């Protein structure tokens, strides 16, 4: 999980989006294929250099593109064609969220397996039940664990819905009208990054996706 949210991985994911967009534009004939090969071979960045440029110009994506351009050279002019900053940032963020969701889901599935096994193991182990915070009628420890198992299964499904809700990207330009970018670029990049294109967007992926996703995540805290 730490690797997913490491700052270098954040910028690398943005670079992956940019390179994929270059590949799509090359297929459309908007970028020389030779230039794309140069970009793929040379593209890199130094995180501290990004921060250094950002302090001067106060624009993180321009700082990022400038830092990458120092490695790529003349072919850097083909990077970010027709795109707006959030085409890169929102799409890359949602890739990271998808990756993090996969880690969480895998962890919950392992937890569910353990809880199921323990519920059977302690099926006949007596324990005291509680109501109103005090002792009530007897129950079994296995039944208590089975309750946690059932809740974990629901949380797995919630996490899957949350991940699906966030698995969208957009490369549709400054106001979502594809004024300077072909919709094929969005389709190509999203498919390559494991996302689906946002149906309608402005400059950003609409934040109702995030609201629904975070609501599902908060459900884990109620157990």
Identify the meaning behind each predicted range.
Residues 197-204:
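A structural signal for small-residue-enriched, beta-sheet-centric alpha/beta enzyme cores
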Residues 211-213:
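Acidic, proline/serine/threonine- and glycine-rich low-complexity intrinsically disordered segments
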Residues 207:
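The DNA-recognition helices of helix-turn-helix-type DNA-binding domains
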Residues 1-178, 182-192, 197:
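A helix-coil-helix interface module used to build multimeric assemblies
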Residues 216-223:
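Single conserved hydrophobic/aromatic residue that forms the stacking wall/gate
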């Amino acid at each position: 999980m730490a690797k997913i949210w490491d700052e270098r991985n954040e910028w690398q994911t943005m670079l992956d989006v940019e390179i994929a967009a270059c590949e799509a534009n090359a297929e459309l004939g908007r970028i020389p294929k030779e230039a794309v090969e140069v970009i793929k071979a040379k593209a890199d960045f130094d995180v501290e250099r990004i921060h250094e440029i950002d302090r001067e110009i106060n624009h993180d994506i321009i700082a990022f593109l400038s830092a990458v351009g120092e490695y790529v050279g003349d072919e850097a002019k083909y990077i970010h064609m027709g795109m707006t900053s959030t085409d890169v940032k929102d799409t890359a963020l949602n890739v990271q969220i998808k990756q993090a969701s996969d880690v969480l889901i895998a962890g919950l599935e392992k937890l569910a397996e353990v809880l199921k096994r323990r519920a059977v193991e302690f099926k006949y182990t007596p324990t005291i039940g509680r109501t109103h915070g005090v002792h009530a009628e007897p129950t079994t420890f296995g039944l208590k664990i089975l309750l946690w198992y059932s809740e974990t299964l629901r949380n797995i499904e919630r996490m899957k819905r949350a991940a699906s809700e966030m698995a969208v990207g957009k490369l549709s330009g400054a106001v979502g009208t594809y004024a300077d970018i072909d919709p094929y670029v969005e389709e190509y990049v999203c498919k390559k990054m494991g996302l689906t294109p946002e149906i309608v967007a402005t400059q950003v992926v609409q934040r109702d996706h995030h609201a629904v996703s975070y609501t599902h995540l908060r459900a884990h805290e109620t157990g």
